[in-house]
Swiss-Prot record:
Pfam families referenced in this protein's UniProt entry, alphabetically: Aldedh (PF00171)
Organism: Xanthomonas oryzae pv. oryzae (strain KACC10331 / KXO85)
Protein known as: Gamma-glutamyl phosphate reductase
Keyword Nucleus applies: no
Keyword field: Amino-acid biosynthesis, Cytoplasm, NADP, Oxidoreductase, Proline biosynthesis
Class of enzymatic activity (EC top level): oxidoreductase
UniProt-annotated location(s): Cytoplasm
Catalytic activity annotation: L-glutamate 5-semialdehyde + phosphate + NADP(+) = L-glutamyl 5-phosphate + NADPH + H(+)
Pathway: Amino-acid biosynthesis; L-proline biosynthesis; L-glutamate 5-semialdehyde from L-glutamate: step 2/2
Domain of life of the organism encoding this protein: Bacteria
Length: 414
């Protein structure tokens, strides 16, 4: 079956999903969660095959962490589906209502986007998360995962499709692309008359390929080169907490810290504390000349290090003269994802917030809060770094659009 045929079937199924009541969608997602639990053995066995193949290829530890499933992670995925089921339904929500002087009633109403193509790598949880969010928002979804997770993705998709069938919803509403050739993905990205939005999540190469070749509208979920700037006024213990949580708790996450910027006035006090805490957690440190003057044992940092999304226990460090220098560094090397300042100076905090265009800006809070669930969205399909209708963590509402509904009693304009 061609990718165009699959997309057409998904579009037809999306029309069915768009007409489901909130109650029906809630029940469907609950059933999808139960299907994952029922198929746990099959899914974990499939994941073991993917992990074995990935290790044989020498896959990096960060990628292996993203790929791996276990009982706890699978239970978390099922729980996340149940949480999505209970979220408020954005479809049909009236966001504006007005009666014009001529008597027509004008409403802006949220409706599903239609068909969403999700293109991603090495994250089998995305198969379930994206399916749940897209269906809850009344859409169909085409899932194109990476070859490294093909067995996991297939097992998860089969379980979810069974729940769709049992609810009398066309299983094409959740379409998994099993032909992973690049030319097939390229054909999918050309189907702008069928697919309404493409969302790539993965490495820089994948996202650039999608952005450069798509005729379908694209919202990029670009790499997370996230910074922590420790201002001269920062409380040391607070800054250390932000640093350790941001770098060492889950370095493979896109909201983990990759670069530490430290104000020169406190570098001699803060850097030794930071280095000790990070070494205890096996973090490799790389720094500029000013950082190495305080920490001579660490490796030098290159321009490539400052632009890198390590997704590993590696941290680039730099001493900066002031807030302006920190901002200039972030503008040069950042990816518009998430930036953090540790400061007790309210003026500097406000200038940091106002001077950066990043999707998420934190003041005295960990970069790890850059997550849809943590920010009150309930769940997210990703973190948009594209300044379009959705910027930052994308929840259910971002998978809908507003349209006008006008009701009258025969009014004409002329």
């Amino acid at each position: 079956m061609t990718i165009k045929t699959l997309a057409l079937q998904c579009r037809d199924a999306a029309q069915v999903v768009s007409q489901l009541s909130s109650q029906a969608k809630c029940a469907l997602l609950q059933a999808m969660a139960a299907a994952l639990e029922a198929d746990a053995g099959t899914i974990l066995a499939a994941n073991a095959r993917d992990l074995e193949a990935a290790r044989a290829k020498g896959t990096a530890s960060a990628m292996l962490d993203r790929l791996a499933l276990d009982d706890k992670r699978l239970a978390g995925i099922a729980a996340a589906l149940r949480e999505v089921a209970l979220l408020p339904d954005p479809v049909g929500r009236i966001t504006r209502e007005d009666v014009r002087p001529n008597g027509i009633r004008v409403q802006k109403v949220r409706v599903p986007l239609g068909v969403i193509a999700m293109i991603y790598e090495a994250r089998p949880n995305v198969t379930a998360d994206a399916a749940a969010l897209c269906i809850k928002a009344g859409n169909g979804v085409i899932l194109r995962g990476g070859s490294e997770a093909i067995h996991s993705n297939t097992a998860i998709a089969r379980a979810l499709q069974r729940a769709l069938r049992e609810a009398n919803v066309p299983e094409a509403a959740l379409t998994l692309v099993e032909d992973l050739r690049r030319e097939t993905m390229l054909e999918l990205l050309q189907l702008n008359d069928i697919v309404d939005l493409a969302i790539p999540r993965g490495g820089e190469g994948l996202i650039r390929f999608v952005a450069e070749h798509a005729r379908v509208p694209v919202i990029k979920h670009y790499k997370g080169v996230c910074h922590l700037f420790v201002d001269a006024s920062a409380e040391m213990e607070l800054a250390l907490r932000l640093l350790i949580d941001g770098k060492a708790t889950r370095p493979s996450a896109c909201n983990s810290l990759e670069t530490l910027l430290v104000h020169a006035d406190i570098a001699e006090r803060f850097l030794p504390l930071a280095a000790q805490a990070l070494r205890e957690r096996k973090v490799e440190l790389r720094g500029d000349a000013a950082t190495r003057a305080v920490l001579p044992e660490i490796a030098p940092a290159s321009d490539d290090d400052y632009a890198a999304e390590f997704l590993d226990l590696i941290l680039a460090m730099r001493v900066v003269a002031d807030l302006d220098t920190a901002l200039a560094h972030i503008r040069q090397y950042g990816s518009d994802h998430t930036e953090v300042i540790a400061t007790q100076d309210p003026d500097n905090a406000e200038r940091f917030v106002q001077s950066l265009r990043s999707a998420v800006v934190m003041v005295n809070a960990s970069s790890r809060f850059s997550d849809g669930g943590e920010l009150g969205l309930g769940a997210e399909i990703g973190i948009s770094t594209t300044r379009l209708h959705s910027y930052g963590p994308m929840g259910l509402e971002a998978l809908t659009v507003e349209r006008f509904v006008v009701r009258g009693e025969g009014q004409v304009r002329h």
